[in-house]
Amino acid sequence: RVSVELEGNLLSDRFGKYASEADRLEGFPVRSFPIHIEEVPEGSVSLALAFIDFDAIPVGGFCWIHWLACDFDPSTTLIPEDASRTGAIACTQGANSNWSPMAHGSLNPA
């Protein structure tokens, strides 16, 4: 089971378009939110995540990939805030939509 803390059924502003400049790269928000993990099936070898935004299709014309990551230890119970940038927890990260020239022309993986 995976859960994230919400404020009024939404992620905190610091993780989205209202993020501070310190949490932006090339104008885009890049701070990942904390993810709580429970009840991982016994015998699991690793964990993976895909944070994909289907609501972006009408705006950008394609599904926005915010974060892809794998090889989390199956005993992980918390992926801490900003782990995508800080490397606070061991994992292998994939390319997100910031790498796509269809997004905004940047090749920075954020």
Regions found by a protein language model. Name each.
Residues 1-110:
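N-terminus-centered regions that define maturation/targeting leaders and the start
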